[in-house]
């Protein structure tokens, strides 16, 4: 078991904190695009804001896969959101990746987003999926497999617990008071402070 696999087997809230600082990698157009995870939100099976709360559907079926599987969904008729499945198979929990700090492949990210401002490339769930060219083709990918087109990469430079801000989730209408959003303090690439 690698370190990322161990993180994703933690309780989802703990995993959402521990994923901060690690890398999301996209292999696109013969380029490697890398972003450091700087903001996450946890979604639990008993959480009214979680897609698996009511029941299993075709759309949310990947939430029930093994930890480390990608769960990508289309929202508002125009955006994709990228999640990392956590917990045991059949539970239905995931972590929404809300923001990344661009690390490598920045020129391609700028082309993908039609934006040049670095701070605006990946500072939100829809922005980062556009920058890394993540869409429904990436739903159900094993993010722990080094040969996957989208994967998680471990960062040995771990984030200290005192540098993690915990707050309410944003951009949702149900259970928005739950303190399940986490971000790296003072990081300029976070979507909202």
Curated annotation (Swiss-Prot):
What domain of life?
Bacteria
Q: Name one GO molecular function term.
A: alkylbase DNA N-glycosylase activity
Name it. Answer: Putative 3-methyladenine DNA glycosylase
Family named by the database record: Belongs to the DNA glycosylase MPG family.
Against PANTHER family, the record matches this protein to: DNA-3-METHYLADENINE GLYCOSYLASE
Enzyme class per UniProt: hydrolase
Q: Which UniProt keywords apply?
A: DNA damage, DNA repair, Hydrolase
| UniProt-listed Enzyme Commission number(s) | 3.2.2.-
Question: InterPro entries this protein is in?
Answer: Formyl_transferase-like_C_sf, MPG, MPG_sf
Q: Does the keyword Hydrolase apply?
A: yes
**Biological processes per GO annotation:** base-excision repair
Does the UniProt entry include the keyword Lipid biosynthesis?
no
């Amino acid at each position: 078991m690698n370190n990322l696999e161990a993180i994703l087997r933690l309780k989802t809230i703990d995993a959402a904190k521990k994923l901060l600082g690690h890398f999301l990698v996209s292999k696109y157009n013969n380029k490697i695009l890398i972003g450091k995870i700087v903001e996450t939100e946890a979604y639990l099976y008993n959480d009214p804001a979680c897609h698996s709360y009511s029941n299993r559907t075709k759309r949310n079926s990947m939430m029930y896969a093994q930890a480390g599987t990608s769960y990508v969904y289309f929202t508002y008729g125009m955006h994709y959101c990228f999640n990392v499945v956590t917990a045991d198979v059949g539970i239905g929990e995931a972590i929404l990746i809300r923001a990344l700090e661009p690390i490598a492949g920045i020129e391609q990210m700028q082309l993908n987003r039609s934006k040049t401002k670095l701070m605006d490339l990946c500072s939100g769930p829809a922005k980062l999926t556009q920058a890394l060219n993540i869409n429904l083709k990436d739903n159900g990918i094993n993010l722990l497999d080094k040969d996957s087109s989208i994967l998680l990469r471990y960062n040995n430079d771990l984030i200290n617990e005192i540098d993690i801000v915990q707050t309410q989730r944003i951009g949702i209408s149900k259970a928005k008071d739950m303190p399940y959003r986490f971000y790296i303090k003072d990081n300029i690439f976070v979507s909202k402070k």
